[in-house]
A protein has these predicted regions:
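N-terminal secretory/membrane-targeting segments
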Residues: 1-83, 115
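Solvent-exposed soluble domains appended to multi-pass membrane proteins
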Residues: 52-444
């Protein structure tokens, strides 16, 4: 029972065990109670002025005669729209593991090759530090809300995910995972959002040449994925495949004889093995009839470590992404600041279909010169809004902090910029309420 207008005082005076139990059941920290807020209309106006106001899904899927959807060759660097998307979501792949970002160890020869032949995103930032945060961002295109990822929360079914948006437009959404999908509620989340779900329990035993407690070897995951993609392609459906790898994770073991680092090879060995497996997958895919019509997206779920001297060390969220489609895409680098939540609307934009305006994220190919380049980074409690050289952090007890971010990622306390403060609040407050009020539901 509340006795004060001060939420923090009420929490201190309450029954700690009961409060903790309730928080566990809800899997959330109530943004409206614990974080700085704005009037809802002011928050909506800020997002509208930033060009980031979400449309309802009905509006987003409704053709606009004044602004018809379709593949726009004038702003999208592909020769034509792909028919299929295969997204490889790589476990714990920090940008600084890649030679493309200056690593001298030679751990990622194949990824560096694809980066050279594809479109490399050099300033992409993950929203969090766990796989479920990455899946949330890449699938829902929403800023992280305090507490647990939406993937692990109750009432997370029938949301307007990337798959839900594409299914009625002729796509077969599929989620593949090399581990046990009940972990972190992955199976329930994707099944509840119209994805065909396939995890390690669905693969024939004879097809698994190596496995550990965390998952099957990535190469064997990809072998099984290829068979499923072939069958889906034969059915005549367009494909959206989201593949979550596992090998770049403790215990860092993998099949021997693939790379020059024997198993268990620690982090370096796991990164190099994952690189090998991805390279082999794409080599095999080149022989498939659907390859030339497919956009491959290689992106990390999060970094291997987000440790640092500050609460939200910006370099600990820097991840790589490569778009690869040798018959469709001109090689290059995209050097602007991008958030993980921008990937889903970008893919819808590239496919030339309806629905990208429903996401909080914005297609990178629609972000004009005046667009506020920003990224969202978080841990369980702190919510960061990063804009090139400044990080605004929202925390419990309505706390707001600002840091100047140097080129090497060093954070120095700075005076609060009211405009950026309000932008941060507008995004996080609106995202929290959208989920809580069922506004992210597909049929809302």
């Amino acid at each position: 029972m509340a006795f004060s207008n001060n939420a923090y005082a009420n929490e201190l005076a309450g029954n700690g065990v009961m409060t903790f139990g309730a928080a566990l059941r809800r899997n959330e920290l109530d943004y409206s109670r614990f974080y700085a807020t704005l009037p809802d209309e002011q928050a909506r106006k800020i997002l509208r002025d930033l060009g980031s106001e979400r449309e309802t899904l009905i509006e987003a899927l409704q053709p606009d005669i004044n602004e018809p959807e379709g593949f726009d060759k004038s702003r999208i660097p592909l020769t034509r729209a792909p028919k299929h998307v295969v997204m490889i979501m790589v476990e714990s792949l920090s940008a600084d593991f890649l030679g493309s970002f200056g690593n001298p160890k030679g751990l990622t020869p194949r990824l560096d090759e694809f980066a050279e032949k594809g479109l490399l995103f050099t300033q992409l930032y993950a929203t969090g530090t766990r796989t479920v945060r990455g899946l949330e961002a890449l699938t829902l295109g929403t800023p992280p809300i305090p507490g647990q990822s939406i993937v692990r929360r109750p009432n997370n079914e029938q949301l307007a995910t990337l798959g839900e948006v594409l299914r009625p437009q002729g796509f077969e959404p599929m989620f593949f995972y090399g581990g046990y999908g009940y972990f972190d509620n992955m199976n329930a989340f994707f099944q509840g959002n119209s994805y065909q779900v396939v995890d390690r329990t669905d693969f024939p035993k004879a097809s698994i040449g190596f496995e550990n407690v965390w998952g099957i070897g990535d190469e064997f995951l990809f072998n099984n994925v290829l068979e499923r993609l072939d069958k889906t392609h034969e059915s005549g459906k367009r494909m959206l495949a989201q593949i979550m790898t596992t090998s770049n994770h403790r215990p860092f073991t993998y099949a021997n004889g693939r790379i020059d680092i024997p198993s268990p090879g620690g982090r370096d060995g796991a990164v190099k093995y994952t690189d090998y497996a991805i390279g082999r997958f794409l080599d095999d895919a080149k022989n498939k009839p659907w390859f030339n019509d497919t956009l491959f997206v290689i992106v990390a779920d999060h970094c291997a470590s987000a440790a640092g001297k500050s609460k939200l060390p910006v370099p600990g969220y820097h991840i790589p992404m490569v778009m690869y489609a040798p018959k469709l895409l001109k090689p290059g680098k995209y050097k602007e600041l991008v958030s993980q939540i921008d990937i889903a609307p970008t893919l819808i934009d590239v496919l030339g279909v309806e629905g990208d305006d429903h996401f909080f994220g914005t297609s990178v190919f629609e972000q004009g010169k005046n667009f506020q380049r920003r990224a969202f980074i978080s841990n369980y409690q702190e919510l960061g809004y990063f804009t090139q050289n400044q990080l605004t952090v929202l925390g419990p007890k309505q706390k707001v902090e600002t840091f100047r971010i140097a080129k090497d990622g060093t954070a120095t306390p700075a005076e609060i910029n009211e405009q950026l403060r309000n932008e941060a609040i507008a995004f996080y407050q609106t995202a929290f309420k959208a989920f809580k009020n069922n506004e992210l539901k597909y049929k809302k």
